[in-house]
């Protein structure tokens, strides 16, 4: 053991990453716990770990918690998964818009008869013998279960149909791994796999900014605690109250809440007919308001009229000195070069032009814009 620890400390961070990556590629999976154990001797920023998790995902390595690593869920997990679902209810969740193909799919699976416990065992026995038809029949009879579970995850950032598709993949894994000898119902066993497939898909695909799976699990736990406290207290719980329930610091809870925030697209449809977008209703803080723009145009017109009362040279000197045409002011010397005179001469012309503009006959036309 001591030799192993000594050897571990001799490895660099990159070498440990390489070893973990190779192990993950061979097995197809790594646990967060084994990564943490191998990395414990290094000082690593959370950003570095997130980058490494993302790299592993790109390499096809699945990241899971240790309690998820077993090939099959344990008894406690199955007990937790065992819930009563209304498999005859194939209605669409409120707020979900579906098209004809989805409606046809729901109608189709509603025609498939549910299986009794004896039939499930009979099909499972045939599946062990390699009967593909039994595998298909067992899966089809439980497609309603997938829909029932998928309904509970609507509003998490994925389309209802996508949730169903991910759940169906979990169902197929359950069909492959179901062992009827252990005594539990297939629906109980399949529920665990369906949920796992859906929650992982949400973690990987639902968010614009991807969050590591372990953080998604923490966010989901926080949301559950938040809802429970809302019911108990009759108001939104404070970060301190959530922290106490989750055994975390209030600062950590605030950090998780910040991470959990979803970016909202400016193209989000608004209105019953989706004929407007969210961006249409958000003020551009840098844009000039219509009233200011109108006032500016009127001032510009009045200024042009007033400047027309000066001589051409006086008007052009003021335009250059104050940048009235292009927004760039010039020095006396720069303007002098344009007219081929000294800077002192330009100063005199400017002073004379400004005196003329201050005369009540001209200035009263501009004073209203100063109020």
Swiss-Prot record:
DNA-binding region (UniProt annotation): 332-351
A biological-process GO annotation: DNA-templated transcription initiation
Recorded GO MF terms: DNA binding; sigma factor activity
Pfam families, per the entry: Sigma70_r1_1, Sigma70_r1_2, Sigma70_r2, Sigma70_r3, Sigma70_r4
Keywords, ordered alphabetically: Cytoplasm, DNA-binding, Sigma factor, Transcription, Transcription regulation
Function: Sigma factors are initiation factors that promote the attachment of RNA polymerase (RNAP) to specific initiation sites and are then released. This sigma factor is the primary sigma factor during all growth phases, stress and during sporulation. It associates with the RNAP core at all growth stages with a slight increase in stationary phase.
Other facts: A conformational change of sigma-A occurs during its association with the core enzyme.
PANTHER family named among the record's database cross-references: RNA POLYMERASE SIGMA FACTOR RPO, RNA POLYMERASE SIGMA FACTOR RPOD
Identification of the protein by name: RNA polymerase sigma factor SigA
Gene: sigA
